[in-house]
Amino acid sequence: VIFKGITFNEFKGKKDPDAVYKTMRISFENENGVYEETVFCPKEGDDVRQVSSNNGVERESPSNFEKFKFMLAHIGEQLAPKKYEAFKTKTFALPEEFEKLVKTFADITKDAVNKHTNLKLIANKKGEPCLPYFVNISKAGDAYISNNWLGDKVFFSDYEISQMNKQKSNGPTDMPGTSSDDFATSNDAATDNADLDFEV
């Protein structure tokens, strides 16, 4: 893929026109199309790790804030390693300085725009492309990148390959009493006042 850059965006909510959402958009493209990952400004509570229970075993998941930090780290280390070293020493108060953070990060990665790289995408439950889960919690309780999705060291696990093959083999569902003629076709083509520390 080709890295097309990072942009800051804001838009008003549909349900609540008074609500303004601030996002960071990361763009890639190749001959098959465009992929954009949209990350929302961290909000209060995003630094809390969720705990789920399965068969009596509790499992802690990385917080949204940790995922955001490690996303920036992964992009920075893969696309602008020298400039990222300086960037991660900076501190930004969130959510107030989210726009400043995004524009600063866009600036340190601008030399990588139009650079060819590898991007790992998987399918979500709807079959749409998305980034894989890439942050995990160690036994010691530390968050870490467990799944590279950008750069030269991008690989698919056996499980991910099996899921891709499953997606490819999924055909249309047969519906009794219907035929393809029954359907018309178309050919139209972080938390309040929290400081973001980038030591990861």
PLM features: residue spans?
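Short beta-rich binding modules
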Residues: V1-V200
